[in-house]
C-alpha cells in the first residue's frame, strides 16, 4: 500500500519572514500609488504659486518656496508699507533694492536705466478700474554701488575666469509731498542694461526678462512674505472685479456656490429622508413602481432632459436664480441610500412607539430621524460635493449677470479671460485650487462617516 509523502512544513521563522515580505511589498505598492497621486497634487499646487506655471524645465526652487526670499520679501514689504506679511507701498515707505551685474574682464559695468513703470496689476478686469500707480508716488534714486568679482567658467575652454561685478543699490521712497496718498498694492521696477552685462543676483528674482535679457522686470518689489508666496491667490480675489460695482467676482462666485450647496443639502435631506422612509416602511399601491422610477431616473443623463427642464424654469421665471440650480437635482440617488438605511432600522423600536400611541410621523420625527445621523451625514456630504462640483446646470441656468455665476462656471470665465493668449495660467490654477478647498476640508472632517461600517454602528 503506497503512502503519500508528508508535506514539508516551513519553519515558523521562515513563515514570518514571508508574511513580513508580503506585507512590505503591499505597503510599498500603496506608498508608491499614494506618492504618484499626491505628487501630482503637490506639483500642481507648486505651479499655482509660480508666475509662469508652464515654464520648461519645471523648477523646484524659486522665490515662492524659498525661505530666504520670504524673509527678504517681508523686509521689503515692511519698508514699503509697514506690513511684513502683505507688503505694499504707502506714505512713509522707504526701501533699498540691490541688484548685481557682471561683465567680461575689461568691460566697464555701467549703471542700468532704472524705472518704476506705470504698470497695471495684470491682464484681468482690475486693470480697467485701477487708478493708483506706484510710478505717480515713487521717488527712485541710486543710493550707492559696490564692486566685487566672481568666478565664471568659460564654456568654450572649460577654464575658470575672474569676472568683475558691481552691485547697485536703488532707493525707492514714497514722495513726502504726497503724504496723503493711497496705499498701493504693487511697486514694479524695470532695469535696462547693456547687452554685455548680465544680472547675476538681486534681492528678489526678476518676474521676467525682456529684450533678450537686456531688461529685467519685477512686478512687485514690496510683496511681503505672504504676498510673495500667495500672489496668484491674492490676484484671484483682487483682480476679478465687477466693472459696475468694483466688488470681487471670485468672492461672489464662492458665496453663490456655498448658498446653492447648502440649499441643496437642506432640501436633499428633507425630501430624501421622507421619501426613503415612505418607500421603506409604508405599504401602498404603486410603491414598487415609484421605486423603479427612482432607479430609472438615475440612469438618465442630465443632458437628455435639460431642454425640457430649461423651458420649465423659463416659464416659471426661475432662470438666473439660485433656486433653479438648487432644485434641479435635489434627490436622485439619495432616496435610495435613505431607503436602504431605513430598511435596516429595527422595526421593534417603531412598533413599540406605535403601541404607546405615537403617530407614524411622530415615530419618524422623534425616533427614526434622530438615530439616522450617520446616513444623513453621508447624504449631506455627497449632496454638498455634487452641488459644489456641478458645472452643467449652473452653466445652463445661470448666464447673467457675471456675479451670479458659481465658482465652477467662474473658473471657465477665468480660463477665457486669463488663459489662452494672455497666458496667465498661474491665476487660473490658483482659482482652481481655491475651489477644491471646501470639499477637501469637508472630507477631512467627516471622512469617517462615509464608511459603511459607521452607518451600521449608528443603527446599533
Predicted features and spans:
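A structural signal for multi-pass alpha-helical bundles of membrane permease subunits
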Residues: 2-4, 14-81, 85-91, 104, ...
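Beta-strand-enriched, solvent-exposed domains that form extended recognition/catalytic surfaces
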Residues: 81-197
Amino acid at each position: 500500500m503506497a503512502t503519500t509523502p508528508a508535506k514539508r512544513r516551513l519553519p515558523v521563522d521562515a513563515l514570518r519572514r514571508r508574511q513580513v515580505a508580503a506585507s512590505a511589498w503591499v505597503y510599498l505598492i500603496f506608498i508608491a500609488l499614494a506618492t504618484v497621486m499626491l505628487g501630482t497634487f503637490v506639483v500642481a499646487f507648486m505651479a499655482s504659486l509660480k508666475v509662469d506655471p508652464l515654464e520648461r524645465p519645471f523648477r523646484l526652487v524659486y522665490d515662492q518656496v524659498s525661505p530666504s526670499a520670504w524673509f527678504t520679501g517681508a523686509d521689503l514689504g515692511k519698508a514699503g508699507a509697514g506690513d511684513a506679511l502683505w507688503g505694499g507701498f504707502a506714505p512713509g515707505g522707504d526701501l533699498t533694492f540691490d541688484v548685481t551685474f557682471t561683465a567680461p574682464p575689461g568691460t566697464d559695468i555701467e549703471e542700468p536705466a532704472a524705472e518704476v513703470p506705470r504698470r497695471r496689476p495684470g491682464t484681468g478686469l482690475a486693470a480697467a478700474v485701477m487708478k493708483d500707480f506706484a510710478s505717480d508716488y515713487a521717488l527712485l534714486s541710486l543710493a550707492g554701488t559696490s564692486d566685487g568679482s566672481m568666478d565664471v567658467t568659460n564654456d568654450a575652454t572649460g577654464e575658470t575666469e575672474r569676472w568683475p561685478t558691481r552691485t547697485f543699490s536703488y532707493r525707492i521712497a514714497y514722495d513726502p509731498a504726497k503724504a496723503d496718498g493711497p496705499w498701493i498694492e504693487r511697486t514694479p521696477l524695470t532695469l535696462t542694461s547693456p547687452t554685455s552685462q548680465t544680472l547675476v543676483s538681486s534681492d528678489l528674482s526678476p518676474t521676467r526678462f525682456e529684450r533678450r535679457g537686456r531688461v529685467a522686470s519685477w512686478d512687485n518689489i514690496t510683496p511681503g512674505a505672504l504676498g510673495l508666496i500667495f500672489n496668484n491667490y491674492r490676484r484671484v480675489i483682487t483682480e476679478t472685479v465687477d466693472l459696475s460695482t468694483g466688488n470681487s467676482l471670485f468672492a461672489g462666485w464662492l458665496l453663490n456656490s456655498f448658498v446653492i450647496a447648502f440649499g441643496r443639502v437642506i432640501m436633499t435631506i428633507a425630501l430624501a429622508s421622507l421619501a426613503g422612509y415612505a418607500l421603506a416602511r409604508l405599504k401602498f399601491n404603486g410603491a414598487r413602481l415609484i421605486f423603479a422610477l427612482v432607479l430609472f431616473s438615475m440612469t438618465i443623463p442630465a443632458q437628455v432632459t435639460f431642454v425640457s427642464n430649461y423651458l420649465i424654469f423659463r416659464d416659471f421665471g426661475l432662470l438666473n436664480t439660485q433656486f433653479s440650480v438648487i432644485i434641479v437635482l435635489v434627490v436622485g440617488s439619495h432616496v435610495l441610500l435613505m431607503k436602504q438605511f431605513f430598511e435596516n432600522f429595527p422595526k421593534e423600536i417603531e412598533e413599540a412607539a406605535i403601541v404607546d400611541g405615537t403617530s407614524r410621523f411622530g415615530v419618524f420625527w422623534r425616533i427614526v430621524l434622530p438615530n439616522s445621523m450617520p446616513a444623513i451625514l453621508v447624504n449631506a456630504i455627497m449632496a454638498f460635493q455634487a452641488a459644489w462640483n456641478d458645472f452643467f446646470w449652473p452653466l445652463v441656468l445661470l448666464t447673467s449677470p457675471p456675479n451670479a455665476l458659481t465658482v465652477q462656471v467662474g473658473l471657465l470665465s477665468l480660463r477665457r479671460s486669463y488663459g489662452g493668449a494672455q497666458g496667465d495660467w498661474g491665476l487660473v490654477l490658483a482659482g482652481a485650487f481655491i475651489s477644491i478647498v471646501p470639499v477637501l476640508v469637508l472630507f477631512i472632517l467627516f471622512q469617517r462617516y462615509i464608511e459603511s461600517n459607521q452607518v451600521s454602528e449608528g443603527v446599533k
